[in-house]
């Protein structure tokens, strides 16, 4: 399947931004499940391209003159290949392939402030410890989290910790992924966060979509995906942008600035099947 993606982000400010740096992770990862045919990042001035510590393509945009708005646009076409049969739950990122030898999966056993557990979440995780080292056990864990934490439509607010999200009980796909990752790491299983998009039969008629997120866990010498929001439903295609220890490592755009006053952000993403 060929997916055409257009992603536009507009930041506006009620006072001039004196200087800013934006860290942009809007270039899809290339692997056995997805291959870039065309891709472009448009920024007010040329951004520096590099790779971060997780292997994501990273564009760094630095503006050192006053501005009242910042526009960032990513667009292109990606060829995707869907999983087959019993491999349905395997990830678009690295599924069926050994881990990148330069980055051990053990890196993803370390808890972050966003993926730390409290007593309540630790108790919940321990209830699934018996079979957590198996794919079936992790699927049971993912299902239990999804049942306890149904998605609240439209909830894409500030990033909160896994423990806070678990206590709230009904939040975003980001929070579901963080809780799953926190449980995995607490039980000794490497797990990581994935940001990206999802195309499905229920996508809006105008092609507008929201960003998507899921988790991956390391079992049997490969990464397996766990999309708690959709359970990898049929008629879908997942497109991975970036991976990281949590959302803060893998979010599409993250920045710092001096000045600017109140910031307003408008994001619009459109995805369609290309011929």
Model-flagged regions — what are they?
Residues 47-50, 96-97, 233-241:
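Short, surface-exposed linear segments at secondary-structure transitions and domain or protein termini
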Residues 1-95:
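Intrinsically disordered, low-complexity N-terminal segments that are enriched in acidic
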Residues 93-171, 179-181, 247, 258-275:
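Secondary-structure boundary elements
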Residues 11, 15, 24, 34, ...:
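Flexible, active-site-adjacent loop/turn segments at secondary-structure boundaries
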Residues 18, 22, 31, 68, ...:
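Short capping/connector residues at structural and topological boundaries
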Residues 25-27, 42-44, 75, 216, ...:
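Residues in well-ordered beta-strands of folded domains
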Residues 20, 143, 175-263:
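Hydrophobic/aromatic-rich core segments of domains that either
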